[in-house]
A protein has these predicted regions:
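N-terminal helix-turn-helix DNA-binding core of bacterial DNA-binding proteins
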Residues: 23-70, 90, 94-102
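Short glycine/proline-rich, acidic loop/turn segments that cap or connect secondary-structure elements
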Residues: 2, 77-78
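Residues at the C-terminal ends
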Residues: 53, 81-82
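Generic helix-packing signal
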Residues: 33-36, 77, 107
Length: 120
């Protein structure tokens, strides 16, 4: 679906903009960029969206998302190495969950901005 671009005046009329202090943002910019890089991969984004619903084991994630096992393992390793997910072992299963509430806030915002209304 092609995207429609609107002039900046359209956005000014539609959205009240919060005051963003660039100097304050600078102190957290590297961390913010790191999170955005992690979310910039579609498989990782979908994994985190699924995990935003609660804890899941690898088998559940593979079934629910349809991601191949090698890709799933690779992307979960990235999320673990970047401390974006927590892990918990129960028997032979490893369960994953989102580690940081800020990541959940970003996912909620992305869902609100990019997901059609009325669909989960």
């Amino acid at each position: 679906m092609p995207q429609t671009f609107y002039p900046s005046t359209f956005y000014a009329m539609q959205i009240s903009h919060p005051v963003i202090d660039p100097q304050l943002l600078r102190s957290g910019a590297a961390q913010a960029v790191g999170v955005l890089k992690i979310l910039a991969n579609e498989d990782r984004l979908m994994l985190l969206c699924q995990l935003s619903q609660g804890e899941h084991c690898v088998g559940e994630l593979q079934t629910e998302l349809g991601i191949s096992q090698p890709t799933l393992s690779q992307q979960l390793a990235v999320l673990r190495n970047e401390c974006v997910v927590n892990t918990r072992r129960e028997g032979k299963n490893i369960y994953y969950s989102v580690a940081d509430a800020r990541t959940l806030e970003i996912l909620v915002l992305l869902h609100r901005l990019y997901c059609p209304e009325g669909k989960n």
